[in-house]
Regions:
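C-terminal segment of N-terminal export signals and the immediately downstream linker at the start
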Residues: 1, 21-42
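Short, cationic motifs built from Arg/Lys/His that form the positively charged side of catalytic pockets
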Residues: 3-4, 50
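Compositionally biased, low-complexity segments enriched in small residues
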Residues: 4, 26-27, 373, 387
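N-terminal export signals
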Residues: 7-28
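Extended recognition/assembly regions associated with phosphoester-bond processing machinery
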Residues: 38-432
């Protein structure tokens, strides 16, 4: 796949996109109408639910009850026009190294008893609330036809934005741009180059190592936890490399050798040697189970090769973006330099990401107001957060977009701000 094809190969939707993916064209069976007529003018954005099978390595267990309650609350509200899930709805990455990877069907079946799947199904059945799912990295393979069919059959009416190789974005009014955010990260962006016929990046294998360590230690580790620990600490990397008998040591310079040293150190930390193999069962076109050493070899140039794969963010920023710094990617979209203009249909005023598991809110005033917000996550180890956008038409064609960051259990938003734009076009929402 060519670099520009990779960059432009993300599904984008305004009013709707078909279940099969595509370019966001409204299907003929959907009749748009104004949300104002029904008094519904709020968009609710959540991300990083990480539904998984039951297990001591799963990231969502204790918070599942709260998540189900939240979805029921959304369903009962009379001001919500749409629920948008910005990626990592499902998690088929967090699976112990020696386990057969769980399927989407396995995950959905495991989340009936905790109430999350039934609650989301009820929202999908609500004729007054549209539901949209945008692909993340931990459910990257949702673009595959069998996976997409499983999601569509479980949640009838849900719009699925997931195109090969695992990218998608939600847009509204040429103002709002919302996606998971993994596209801008070194370890977690789709990788169609390192393993022929595959799409999974190095972050997938790090997630499986984290799951194995969680299983054996009794403490749940997340991939962001590991990247934060090892990428920021060459001393920690060298500690495990030396214990494992590796020659040389990782320096303070980020390069190919450092990235692979981080992976090898995480493998040793999790209790796996170079010859230990990941059970894949033909997943992502792996016809045989790769060893830790095989994975290190396959991905050994992902840092130096990054600029040839995309030119939105550079390879250094791509590493930082995996450490919770996606605000720089949002600022880039606000600036929209000429070199990336042909990759985006408009210059947004509001940008939403997930992925980092860190809720964030950034408002810039001035001649052009902009807001970046991160939806955070619902996993057990973090506060439960979401973002709402209220859209109101003002005088003389003005439209106000009020963005609010919410923490579960609190009666008022933690932060909020409004972006005002001049527009003559009415706000349109799709209804089934």
């Amino acid at each position: 796949m060519k670099r520009r094809d990779f960059l432009k190969g993300l599904a984008v939707t305004g009013a709707a996109a078909s279940v099969a993916g595509g370019l966001g064209i409204i299907p003929p069976f959907i009749t748009p109408r104004t949300a104002h007529a029904a008094g519904r003018n709020k968009l609710v954005f959540i991300s990083d639910l990480h539904m998984n099978v039951d297990g001591s390595y799963s990231w969502l267990v204790k918070h599942a009850v709260d998540l189900a309650r939240f979805l029921n609350d959304v369903n009962s509200r009379d001001d919500v026009a749409e629920l948008i899930i910005l990626g990592d709805l499902l998690d088929d990455w967090v699976s112990p190294v020696k386990y057969t990877p769980q399927t989407f069907a396995d995950i959905l079946a495991a989340n009936y008893n905790n109430g999350v799947v039934p609650a989301l199904q009820e929202v999908c059945r609500n004729p007054d609330i549209a539901v949209t799912y945008v692909v993340g990295n931990h459910d990257m393979l949702s673009f595959m036809s069998d996976n997409k069919e499983v999601i569509a059959n479980t949640f009838p009416g849900m719009t699925i934005i997931s195109d090969s190789p695992g990218l998608g974005a939600y847009t509204r009014d040429d103002i709002i741009w919302a996606e998971h955010g993994h596209r801008y990260t070194l370890f977690n962006a789709p990788d169609t180059w390192s393993h022929a016929g595959g799409d999974l990046p190095l972050g997938y294998f790090i997630s499986r190592l984290a799951a194995s360590k969680s299983l054996t230690s009794g403490k749940v580790y997340t991939t962001p936890d590991l990247l934060d620990l090892f990428v920021k600490s060459p001393a920690e990397v060298n500690k495990y490399l030396q214990e494992g008998g590796y020659e040389g040591e990782a320096g303070n310079v980020i390069d190919n050798a450092f990235i692979i040293a981080v992976f090898n150190a995480i493998a040793l930390w999790a209790g796996f040697w170079p010859w230990d193999k990941f059970t894949m069962e033909d997943l992502d076109d792996y016809t045989s189970n790769p060893s830790v050493e095989d994975i290190a070899f396959l991905y050994d140039t992902i840092f130096s090769g990054w600029p040839s794969r995309q030119n939105i963010v550079d390879h250094y920023e791509a590493v930082l973006n995996d450490l919770g710094h996606l605000n720089s990617a949002a600022n880039l979209l606000f600036e929209m330099p000429d070199r990336i203009k042909d990759l985006y249909p408009f210059t947004p005023r509001v940008v939403l990401f997930g992925h980092t598991h860190q809720a964030a809110f950034q408002y810039h005033s001035g001649q052009v107001e902009t807001i970046y917000a991160n939806t955070g996550t619902w996993i057990d180890s973090k506060p439960m957060t979401w973002v709402e956008i209220e859209i109101n038409n003002g005088d003389s064609g003005r439209r106000d977009y009020t963005v609010s960051l919410w923490f579960y259990g609190e009666s008022s938003p933690k932060q909020s701000g409004t972006v005002s734009v001049q527009s003559e076009q009415g706000y349109v929402i799709r209804h089934r």
